[in-house]
């Protein structure tokens, strides 16, 4: 739901406005009623006494809007649904109107209006709730300044030119509002609160925005201009005169609409019945209250709402079968919306119910007749100048955090620019759908970018709070390359001669042919050059802006259906290679194969028919990097060149030998060129007339923007990821493969680290890419993107290519050897993993959804339709390998799968060498099954609209671009998480030596996880150090203590300011006035001098709480690691911990490591998705860490009165657990059994998977007894929303980790939720190693917002 408050000042009194409004409504009703498809019927007009606003007039109208909505949307609606029913309650100066539509039950427009004698300064006319205020956008409409579409502009309706002959008012200046307020002239304002709701899958945001921008705002601008400029017609009229005009208008409307009624007699009776009516207007004879006092009774009761279902009985429209089919379509996707959460399908907060009491009472009749006025092709208009948003700005996803007052140190540089808060820049290359006509609608492109920006903001506020303000979105409009192809193919349709058979004509359009024709056009090359130029311009504008001036983060591209093709080819054209790190997905690639002929056959065709000159004719005959072989030489002159090796230079004539492919035989290259010529001849026969009549470089004008290099230009920045939304790129590349059989598609490597091809399986525009890179992938389903409603932080399934190859070993071997004729360099082996290539939703530390809950899902009785099998099994056990499923087969982990032998090393290396990145490329999104029954012509528009508003897409994108530097619980209850802002500004250090000591060192602060009873002391202790080994102590400096008392959405409460002692320690006892009840509360201590901080939690528990203790190194780690490398995780460990947490036990993690490693260890726990719990460390380096563990556990038992239920560890921990009087049945030891300890503990010999099965099925694990504790403890995981730089910045992109094995045979173990069979929770070594091996404490940038911890 989109909620906007329009404020429309007018230079008249409230009473004059009433007359003007009534006159304008009846006049527009006469002028704009044409019959079926466009017109108004008045069905009921009666007074009411106990309704909205007290007493007034109720009116029931029907608007026929079939001519005013887009054809693709009209094709999916039943004919009876092409009408809008209006119910209005008018108690002037308060009115309320509600619009609904038959057969579209999830659609409504509620408009509530107050008319006040001010200029729009009233801050809260409607007394909105906090939830509604958060969603509200205030939009001022100025009848003078706001632009009007050219096709609607009339000189006589221009307030800047109009002057009344009766009143001598006008013309109005651009600052007329200020002038009228100063001179005390009459002025009033219409406050209109408009709520638009269209709760249908995939279309909600686009349709709601469409209604607001075109059906409401544009109509209101025009109507109020007319109300002012028509004052010579209505000035001096009385209410009696208005009533007579309304009667005449109603009779005229009834007669005109009756001509199109199939039942003439019924229509005649309708005319007679309406003619007898005394009240013919939507307004009451006299207002019940005109003194301007607030009117009571705003709630809309049931008896006030008359049913609009009677309109379904109208005999107009198609046959009943057509009605039932269309109605079923809409109900199907509406049902899908009902089964999902509000976050996915509509923007309304869950507190906003569907009850009528929650709808605002809106604008009355102002925009009645113009509700959907001529919106088939809306004119672009800029309405942002007068738009005052209470949310995020235009395309930037940011939080409204006040700038902090920075007091610089004496030695600081006063002119140094602060670092940019933006860490990720998303460039949206918007090209529209393949069915778009003309140049496209700029406002629609801008609206889509706004929609996805709002979805980013919504998702981040709930589950990724520290990402707020760190991500920026910029729009790059793309040329409509498919419009000419669409026009051509439309003319070829067998139904092209019959304009009345629109749906039949468009259903016969071969959609797959459109991108093939578009990319084969000679104009396509210039379109790619235009995209590169516009992207560079957008990036340059961002760098010049204040927020991007010091930007040093990553840049990602998002390409839609058409924009994705242009983005891919622009990346292939780009002659700026990615750095040759071990982790680069382009390492060893054949960059020289990115020649223009591989991108568009039309380019070679153009070059072959051109004379010399022009730098290669915009790329024909030259290389992609410039410096072509002979400028504009024809194809014949280059026949002797072999395109299978690096004979054509890219930029300066030199090329790294590592970038060469094995040289092919000359006969192969000859065959390749012959094939090109054959294709040229075929295309030339289609375009011969064009090529013969036009000069050589028909489109060589683009070379002026390419510096005469003969190439299409390049991006001025590095690009890390390319995201494609429903893009038919696979078809385009398949055509190029067909044209040039010797071409391997993998050779067309885009200049980015990873390609993500997101699509809906039912989208006719989409196609897969993976089978083009490796044929055997056609047998594997695309990776199913988890639903945001179920798994807001991801379901833990691995997207790594190496895991897919290992898991589906048998499937790959069944389908034989790779099909690519070219052999990838075998010397490369398997690329070493890097942070950029592995920090996916799999390795993202924020994916903390419980893995055991996935494993425990029972299969439902599902339909056997392909789309259900593909899309509806997101969390269910997959069917047999022969049945397509959303995730790899055999998701249920089994020991047999874990021990399955891997593919031969050469095979893995060969497939990986051809891959565009190190993760899966094809990703399937959820869509309702009912969409398969929709008309084909409607699907491209519908699916294209769905990507921008999909929370599935946005959460997936966030997981790919995030990295994490600190830890926190991430709740899964859907509540918004409060954003932390330091309560105190930065100050000078208390000691002059401090700023010298802290040079070139990073903070390593930590707060001990605290445990307390409700009635006992609640003490917080922390230590503030700098350097990974605590080399510098923060002595005598201020530290501010903050706590969140109502997590996760509560406010951060400032408690006190402490001063560190000589060892950097602070201790704080929470006072009685702020004593905490049972629960888990985030704690944050911020250093006043530099705003670095530490995070922790205090857990308040009742006495008798039961807990389960785990030794981190003893029970979880499968390898030994002291500092530098990432310990491997024992398979199934996460699921065992999760099992105990689900039973209601408090989780305690103990380790003998020093507290200086807290950030690293907690980050490692989060990296592997462990449930949240209390973590205990030693106080510095101690001689006997086992004694520390025992003493800590004894303290919990003796002083806090907690009870140990079970304990896990290694053989070294047996003595610790025995010291706290645990029985052998409560001690579980991981490792090889020893005779000495056989009677003292239970050994887990068959792994955690078998142990978990025993716990579940032998009833050895009972639920915790203390129900109060179970309600208080959160079931979240360690999540890492991080602080300032949790997003990957450019200097981290190509970093590799030495602990990562270089060969594919070295694979670390994974937990059961990370096992091969389930592929859940596989975690890359590289990111965890980065977290494990370096300090993670963040720094609050000036004005930055850090997520709560």
From Swiss-Prot:
This is Membrane-associated phosphatidylinositol transfer protein 2. The gene is PITPNM2. PROSITE patterns: DDHD. Highly expressed in brain, heart, ovary, testis and thymus. Detected in small intestine, prostate, pancreas, skeletal muscle, liver, colon and placenta. It is found in: Endomembrane system. Residues 653-667 have a biased composition (Basic and acidic residues). It is a peripheral membrane protein. The modification Omega-N-methylarginine is found at residue 828. The keyword Membrane applies. Catalyzes the transfer of phosphatidylinositol and phosphatidylcholine between membranes (in vitro). Binds calcium ions.
